Design a protein with these regions (language model features):
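A recurrent domain-boundary module in secreted/ectodomain proteins
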Residues: 1-7
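Proline-enriched interdomain boundary motifs that mark the N-terminal boundary
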Residues: 7-17
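An aromatic-rich alpha-helical recognition segment common to small helix-rich domains
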Residues: 12, 29, 40, 62, ...
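Conserved aromatic anchor
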Residues: 23-34
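Extracellular low-complexity, O-glycosylation-prone stalks/linkers
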Residues: 34-52, 79-81
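Short beta-strand segments within Ig-like beta-sandwich modules, predominantly Fibronectin type-III
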Residues: 51-59
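Beta-strand-rich modules
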Residues: 66-99
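Short beta-strand elements
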Residues: 94-118
Length: 118
């Protein structure tokens, strides 16, 4: 497959969540050949205000601190996008926003996490 933009995202597969508690979940996916960074998009099911996070590994822990609120009892949808480029920024959110400049909208299939109530 020929990519016109060398920073264009690649399709991420096998997104899964493990170790789900009321306050956190570990999310992992298959590494993408040539990918050096990933953007994680997540949001509460049925709401439109998705959030972004950035990782340079094929894993991410979503917890109350990252979410900036309580996850207990929520259903959260997670999507991942892979990039060849390593992005810079003041924090993981700024890096994710920088990656979206190269966005070709190649998100993984959804991984839905049902956080148990406390």
């Amino acid at each position: 497959m020929l990519l016109l933009n060398p920073n264009a995202p690649r399709k991420v597969t096998n997104v899964k969540s493990t170790n789900i508690t009321p306050t956190s979940a570990e999310i992992s996916w298959n590494s993408v050949t040539g990918a050096n960074s990933y953007v994680i998009r997540y949001g509460v099911d049925g709401q439109t205000n998705d959030r972004l996070h950035y990782s340079e590994t094929a894993s991410f822990t979503l917890d109350d601190a990252v979410f900036a609120g309580e996850l207990a009892g929520l259903k959260v949808n997670v999507y991942i996008q892979a990039f060849e480029k390593i992005y810079t920024g003041s924090d993981e959110i700024a890096k994710a926003n920088a990656a979206m400049v190269d966005n070709a909208n190649v998100w993984s299939n959804v991984c839905t996490i049902d956080f148990p109530s406390k």
